Protein backbone atom coordinates (compact mmCIF):
# COMPACT_ATOMS: atom_id res chain seq x y z
CA UNK A 1 0.00 0.00 0.00
CA UNK A 2 1.26 3.49 -0.80
CA UNK A 3 0.54 4.88 2.64
CA UNK A 4 1.86 3.40 5.84
CA UNK A 5 -0.63 1.51 7.93
CA UNK A 6 -0.04 4.01 10.72
CA UNK A 7 -1.10 6.84 8.41
CA UNK A 8 -4.12 4.84 7.29
CA UNK A 9 -5.15 4.05 10.86
CA UNK A 10 -4.71 7.68 11.87
CA UNK A 11 -6.92 8.75 9.00
CA UNK A 12 -9.49 6.10 9.81
CA UNK A 13 -9.53 7.09 13.47
CA UNK A 14 -10.18 10.65 12.38
CA UNK A 15 -13.13 9.44 10.33
CA UNK A 16 -14.46 7.54 13.35
CA UNK A 17 -14.37 10.75 15.36
CA UNK A 18 -16.29 12.47 12.59
CA UNK A 19 -19.08 9.92 12.23
CA UNK A 20 -21.63 12.63 13.04
CA UNK A 21 -19.99 15.30 10.87
CA UNK A 22 -22.73 16.02 8.35
CA UNK A 23 -24.07 18.88 6.32
CA UNK A 24 -27.77 19.57 6.77
CA UNK A 25 -29.91 22.53 5.75
CA UNK A 26 -29.83 25.27 8.36
CA UNK A 27 -32.96 25.49 10.52
CA UNK A 28 -33.96 27.24 13.71
CA UNK A 29 -33.04 24.12 15.70
CA UNK A 30 -29.85 24.06 17.70
CA UNK A 31 -26.99 21.94 16.41
CA UNK A 32 -27.42 19.49 19.30
CA UNK A 33 -31.15 19.16 18.64
CA UNK A 34 -30.54 18.47 14.96
CA UNK A 35 -27.89 15.89 15.81
CA UNK A 36 -30.21 14.15 18.27
CA UNK A 37 -32.99 14.09 15.71
CA UNK A 38 -30.72 12.69 13.03
CA UNK A 39 -29.37 9.96 15.30
CA UNK A 40 -32.90 8.60 15.64
CA UNK A 41 -33.60 8.47 11.92
CA UNK A 42 -36.39 6.00 11.12
CA UNK A 43 -36.23 4.69 7.54
CA UNK A 44 -39.35 3.96 5.55
CA UNK A 45 -40.27 1.51 2.83
CA UNK A 46 -41.23 2.29 -0.75
CA UNK A 47 -42.94 -0.15 -3.12
CA UNK A 48 -41.31 -0.62 -6.50
CA UNK A 49 -42.38 -2.75 -9.45
CA UNK A 50 -40.03 -5.54 -10.53
CA UNK A 51 -40.04 -8.06 -13.38
CA UNK A 52 -39.91 -11.73 -12.40
CA UNK A 53 -38.11 -14.07 -14.79
CA UNK A 54 -40.14 -17.17 -15.64
CA UNK A 55 -37.42 -19.52 -16.96
CA UNK A 56 -37.85 -22.97 -18.50
CA UNK A 57 -37.62 -26.03 -16.26
CA UNK A 58 -34.42 -27.15 -17.99
CA UNK A 59 -31.70 -25.60 -20.08
CA UNK A 60 -30.66 -21.97 -19.81
CA UNK A 61 -31.97 -18.50 -20.50
CA UNK A 62 -30.24 -15.14 -20.77
CA UNK A 63 -32.10 -12.08 -19.55
CA UNK A 64 -31.18 -8.49 -20.30
CA UNK A 65 -30.52 -6.02 -17.51
CA UNK A 66 -31.08 -2.33 -18.18
CA UNK A 67 -29.91 0.73 -16.31
CA UNK A 68 -32.47 2.72 -14.36
CA UNK A 69 -32.80 6.49 -14.08
CA UNK A 70 -29.94 6.37 -11.58
CA UNK A 71 -27.67 4.65 -14.11
CA UNK A 72 -28.99 5.36 -17.62
CA UNK A 73 -25.73 4.29 -19.29
CA UNK A 74 -25.56 0.94 -17.53
CA UNK A 75 -26.48 -2.36 -19.12
CA UNK A 76 -25.86 -6.02 -18.53
CA UNK A 77 -27.17 -9.53 -18.69
CA UNK A 78 -27.74 -12.52 -16.45
CA UNK A 79 -27.46 -16.06 -17.74
CA UNK A 80 -29.53 -18.57 -15.79
CA UNK A 81 -28.62 -22.25 -16.04
CA UNK A 82 -31.42 -24.44 -14.72
CA UNK A 83 -30.17 -27.42 -12.74
CA UNK A 84 -32.13 -30.19 -11.08
CA UNK A 85 -31.82 -28.57 -7.65
CA UNK A 86 -30.62 -25.00 -8.11
CA UNK A 87 -30.13 -22.23 -10.62
CA UNK A 88 -26.65 -21.01 -11.54
CA UNK A 89 -26.48 -17.30 -12.30
CA UNK A 90 -23.69 -15.66 -14.29
CA UNK A 91 -24.17 -11.90 -14.40
CA UNK A 92 -22.15 -9.03 -15.80
CA UNK A 93 -22.74 -5.33 -16.19
CA UNK A 94 -20.98 -2.35 -17.73
CA UNK A 95 -21.52 1.39 -17.76
CA UNK A 96 -21.76 1.63 -13.98
CA UNK A 97 -19.72 4.23 -12.16
CA UNK A 98 -18.37 3.71 -8.67
CA UNK A 99 -21.00 3.16 -5.96
CA UNK A 100 -19.72 6.29 -4.23
CA UNK A 101 -21.01 8.41 -7.09
CA UNK A 102 -24.47 8.05 -5.51
CA UNK A 103 -23.33 9.28 -2.11
CA UNK A 104 -20.42 8.96 0.29
CA UNK A 105 -22.17 6.13 2.15
CA UNK A 106 -22.24 3.76 -0.84
CA UNK A 107 -19.39 1.30 -1.28
CA UNK A 108 -20.69 -1.72 -3.21
CA UNK A 109 -23.25 -3.03 -5.71
CA UNK A 110 -25.41 -5.91 -4.49
CA UNK A 111 -27.53 -8.20 -6.66
CA UNK A 112 -30.84 -9.47 -5.28
CA UNK A 113 -33.38 -12.12 -6.25
CA UNK A 114 -37.03 -11.29 -5.47
CA UNK A 115 -39.72 -13.96 -5.71
CA UNK A 116 -43.28 -13.37 -6.97
CA UNK A 117 -44.42 -13.72 -3.34
CA UNK A 118 -42.16 -10.86 -2.28
CA UNK A 119 -39.35 -12.77 -0.60
CA UNK A 120 -35.86 -11.43 -1.19
CA UNK A 121 -32.56 -13.29 -1.41
CA UNK A 122 -29.16 -11.67 -1.59
CA UNK A 123 -27.19 -13.18 -4.47
CA UNK A 124 -24.00 -11.32 -3.56
CA UNK A 125 -21.88 -8.27 -4.24
CA UNK A 126 -20.82 -7.60 -7.81
CA UNK A 127 -17.05 -7.61 -8.22
CA UNK A 128 -15.34 -4.89 -10.24
CA UNK A 129 -13.21 -6.31 -13.05
CA UNK A 130 -11.76 -3.55 -15.18
CA UNK A 131 -14.66 -1.48 -16.45
CA UNK A 132 -17.20 -4.22 -15.73
CA UNK A 133 -18.91 -5.72 -12.70
CA UNK A 134 -19.47 -9.47 -12.47
CA UNK A 135 -21.12 -11.99 -10.17
CA UNK A 136 -21.51 -15.75 -10.21
CA UNK A 137 -24.12 -17.07 -7.79
CA UNK A 138 -26.56 -19.91 -7.14
CA UNK A 139 -30.18 -19.90 -6.07
CA UNK A 140 -32.52 -22.63 -4.84
CA UNK A 141 -35.42 -20.45 -6.00
CA UNK A 142 -36.19 -20.91 -9.69
CA UNK A 143 -38.42 -17.93 -10.52
CA UNK A 144 -37.37 -14.47 -9.39
CA UNK A 145 -36.75 -10.86 -10.32
CA UNK A 146 -33.19 -9.55 -10.43
CA UNK A 147 -32.24 -6.07 -9.27
CA UNK A 148 -28.87 -4.50 -8.52
CA UNK A 149 -28.69 -1.80 -5.86
CA UNK A 150 -26.01 0.56 -4.58
CA UNK A 151 -25.39 -0.27 -0.92
CA UNK A 152 -23.14 0.95 1.92
CA UNK A 153 -21.97 -2.57 2.76
CA UNK A 154 -22.51 -6.11 1.54
CA UNK A 155 -24.13 -7.27 4.78
CA UNK A 156 -27.30 -5.20 4.32
CA UNK A 157 -30.42 -7.27 4.99
CA UNK A 158 -32.92 -5.42 2.77
CA UNK A 159 -32.27 -3.76 -0.60
CA UNK A 160 -32.29 0.02 -0.74
CA UNK A 161 -34.32 1.84 -3.36
CA UNK A 162 -31.03 2.85 -5.04
CA UNK A 163 -31.72 0.48 -7.95
CA UNK A 164 -29.20 0.78 -10.78
CA UNK A 165 -30.04 -2.32 -12.87
CA UNK A 166 -33.23 -4.28 -13.38
CA UNK A 167 -34.71 -6.93 -15.66
CA UNK A 168 -36.12 -5.77 -18.98
CA UNK A 169 -39.80 -6.56 -19.43
CA UNK A 170 -40.40 -9.33 -21.96
CA UNK A 171 -42.38 -12.44 -22.84
CA UNK A 172 -40.56 -14.50 -20.19
CA UNK A 173 -41.24 -12.06 -17.34
CA UNK A 174 -44.23 -11.26 -15.13
CA UNK A 175 -44.92 -8.19 -12.99
CA UNK A 176 -44.41 -8.21 -9.22
CA UNK A 177 -43.52 -5.70 -6.51
CA UNK A 178 -41.33 -5.34 -3.44
CA UNK A 179 -40.86 -2.86 -0.60
CA UNK A 180 -37.39 -1.32 -0.75
CA UNK A 181 -35.65 0.66 1.98
CA UNK A 182 -36.18 4.33 1.19
CA UNK A 183 -33.94 7.28 1.86
CA UNK A 184 -30.35 6.12 1.38
CA UNK A 185 -30.02 5.39 5.13
CA UNK A 186 -30.43 9.04 6.09
CA UNK A 187 -32.97 11.87 6.16
CA UNK A 188 -33.37 14.09 3.13
CA UNK A 189 -30.53 16.60 3.01
CA UNK A 190 -28.23 14.59 5.26
CA UNK A 191 -24.73 14.20 3.82
CA UNK A 192 -22.33 11.55 5.06
CA UNK A 193 -18.70 12.57 5.48
CA UNK A 194 -16.65 11.08 2.61
CA UNK A 195 -14.31 8.19 3.38
CA UNK A 196 -10.83 8.27 1.85
CA UNK A 197 -11.41 5.74 -0.91
CA UNK A 198 -8.19 6.73 -2.67
CA UNK A 199 -5.85 5.74 0.15
CA UNK A 200 -5.87 2.02 -0.57
CA UNK A 201 -8.15 0.85 2.23
CA UNK A 202 -9.64 -2.61 1.69
CA UNK A 203 -13.34 -2.43 0.91
CA UNK A 204 -14.13 -4.44 4.05
CA UNK A 205 -12.73 -1.60 6.17
CA UNK A 206 -14.73 1.09 4.39
CA UNK A 207 -17.89 -1.01 4.62
CA UNK A 208 -17.31 -1.51 8.36
CA UNK A 209 -17.14 2.27 8.83
CA UNK A 210 -20.30 2.76 6.82
CA UNK A 211 -22.13 0.16 8.90
CA UNK A 212 -21.00 1.80 12.15
CA UNK A 213 -22.07 5.30 11.26
CA UNK A 214 -25.39 4.15 9.76
CA UNK A 215 -26.18 2.16 12.92
CA UNK A 216 -25.23 5.22 14.98
CA UNK A 217 -27.54 7.39 12.88
CA UNK A 218 -30.36 4.93 13.59
CA UNK A 219 -29.84 5.36 17.33
CA UNK A 220 -28.42 1.87 17.85
CA UNK A 221 -25.33 2.71 19.93
CA UNK A 222 -26.83 1.41 23.16
CA UNK A 223 -27.78 -2.11 22.12
CA UNK A 224 -25.75 -5.29 22.56
CA UNK A 225 -25.17 -5.90 18.85
CA UNK A 226 -23.63 -2.45 18.47
CA UNK A 227 -21.38 -3.07 21.47
CA UNK A 228 -20.20 -6.36 19.96
CA UNK A 229 -19.56 -4.60 16.67
CA UNK A 230 -17.62 -1.87 18.43
CA UNK A 231 -15.40 -4.41 20.18
CA UNK A 232 -14.50 -5.91 16.81
CA UNK A 233 -14.17 -2.43 15.30
CA UNK A 234 -11.59 -1.46 17.91
CA UNK A 235 -9.83 -4.81 17.52
CA UNK A 236 -9.55 -4.25 13.75
CA UNK A 237 -7.95 -0.85 14.25
CA UNK A 238 -5.52 -1.92 16.97
CA UNK A 239 -4.56 -5.17 15.20
CA UNK A 240 -3.90 -3.43 11.89
CA UNK A 241 -1.75 -0.81 13.59
CA UNK A 242 0.19 -3.47 15.48
CA UNK A 243 0.73 -5.75 12.47
CA UNK A 244 1.26 -2.90 9.99
CA UNK A 245 -1.15 -4.42 7.50
CA UNK A 246 -4.70 -5.63 7.01
CA UNK A 247 -4.46 -9.42 7.21
CA UNK A 248 -7.21 -11.84 6.19
CA UNK A 249 -8.02 -12.37 9.86
CA UNK A 250 -8.39 -8.63 10.41
CA UNK A 251 -10.58 -8.27 7.32
CA UNK A 252 -12.71 -11.15 8.57
CA UNK A 253 -13.16 -9.28 11.84
CA UNK A 254 -14.20 -6.20 9.88
CA UNK A 255 -16.90 -8.21 8.09
CA UNK A 256 -18.14 -9.58 11.42
CA UNK A 257 -18.23 -6.06 12.87
CA UNK A 258 -20.30 -4.95 9.88
CA UNK A 259 -22.76 -7.77 10.50
CA UNK A 260 -23.16 -6.74 14.14
CA UNK A 261 -23.70 -3.09 13.22
CA UNK A 262 -26.37 -4.07 10.67
CA UNK A 263 -28.07 -6.29 13.26
CA UNK A 264 -28.00 -3.35 15.69
CA UNK A 265 -29.59 -1.06 13.10
CA UNK A 266 -32.34 -3.55 12.26
CA UNK A 267 -33.09 -4.17 15.94
CA UNK A 268 -33.72 -0.47 16.49
CA UNK A 269 -35.61 0.50 13.33
CA UNK A 270 -37.30 -2.85 12.61
CA UNK A 271 -36.52 -2.95 8.88
Predicted feature locations:
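Surface-exposed loop/edge segments in extracytoplasmic proteins
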Residues: 117-125
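Exposed aromatic-hydrophobic patches
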Residues: 90-93, 98-99, 130-139
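Bacterial N-terminal signal peptides that target proteins for export
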Residues: 2-12
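Noncatalytic modules at the cell exterior or secretory-pathway interfaces
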Residues: 140-147
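Long, charged/polar, soluble alpha-helical segments
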Residues: 29-38, 44-52, 56, 66-70, ...
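Short beta-strands and strand-coil junctions in structured, solvent-facing domains, enriched
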Residues: 97-101, 119-120, 154-157, 239
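Short coil-to-beta strand junction motifs in C2/discoidin
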Residues: 102-109
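Bacterial N-terminal signal peptides
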Residues: 10-20
